[in-house]
Regions:
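Alpha-helical transmembrane-bundle signature of multi-pass membrane transport and export proteins
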Residues: 1-276, 280-283
Length: 284
């Protein structure tokens, strides 16, 4: 799921960059085509019988959302997994939304360099997700989350260290960028940030599903999406405030990298298996 999600995001952002400056009606047509494609694709999803067919739908969105979140908090493992997943989206939102400006200012690159960095980030997440699943061998191993958080922290700090002294005025192409010796450590670190993001998120998604009962699982996923959205909006607000006050993407990336530390402490306090206790086999 992680792999597919970020590959889709990668293609979407590359396509968005490619169509910048084209007439608005072309953008509108592309959006409609993507929407139609998603709708058609959903028709091929296998049908699954409802596990809680008697669930009443609350038509008041605000009241229904509050009720769902209140119910989710009572399930400690589910809520803990949701907070961890939402932090992953918080980090991802900060990196990807600020990456175009970061590429211009600190790497001196144009849109093609941005697309390269975004591709490396997405490839890293896909590779990390696949390897984490392979290493887990069909078991839930929450210790990989701690490994991922450690990697995100270290690589985030290294990225800031590698680029904080760079400040470019003009924009250069991808061949110029690849001719710079300092570019390769930056590319490697960006890939590793995505890689450890995959290790961080995959066990949490597994835990979310295995910790939920069959009758509550769909509602747990819904609650997860709501909290994910709240965290991503919070990421946008934090980014706007810090950039307004300090005008420094490096500072923003530094704070996000260090933010993995209190998040890890929170997760470990709520579940000791994040320190490497015995794994449990996934439910079929």
């Amino acid at each position: 799921m992680n792999r597919g999600t970020f590959v889709a995001i990668l293609f979407g952002q590359i396509l968005g960059t490619a169509v910048a400056g084209v007439p608005p009606y072309i953008v509108g047509i592309l959006v409609l085509l993507v929407a139609v494609g998603g709708t058609v694709g959903s028709l091929f999803m296998p049908s699954v019988p409802a596990k809680a067919a008697d669930t009443q739908i609350e038509w008041n969105i605000v009241r229904g959302t509050k009720s769902l979140l209140r119910e989710t908090v009572r399930y400690k493992p589910v809520f803990t997994a949701i907070i961890g997943i939402s932090w992953f989206w918080f980090v991802g939102a900060v990196y990807t939304t600020q990456l175009p400006t970061f590429t211009q200012i600190h790497l001196g690159g144009n849109d093609n360099v941005f697309n390269l960095m975004l591709a490396l980030f997405s490839i890293g997440i896909a590779a990390g997700s696949v390897l984490c699943a392979k290493f887990s061998r069909e078991r839930l191993m929450l210790a990989w989350v701690t490994v991922g958080a450690l990697g995100l922290t270290v690589c985030g700090l290294v990225l800031v260290w590698l680029t904080h002294g760079h400040r470019f005025e003009g924009l250069n192409g991808i061949f110029w960028f690849l001719s710079q010796g300092w570019a390769y450590p930056v590319m490697a670190v960006m890939t590793l940030i995505g890689f450890f993001g995959g290790f961080f998120s995959v066990p949490l998604y597994t835990w979310l599903q295995t910790a939920s009962s069959e009758t509550f699982r769909a509602r747990a996923v819904a609650a997860n999406n709501i909290v994910n959205g709240i965290f991503m909006v919070s990421a946008a607000v934090l980014s706007a405030v810090l950039l307004f006050l300090f005008d420094s993407i490096s500072l923003l990336y530094l704070i996000v990298a260090l933010g993995n530390i209190p998040l890890s402490v929170f997760l470990i306090k709520r579940e000791r298996r994040f320190l490497g206790a015995a794994a449990i086999r996934k439910k079929p």
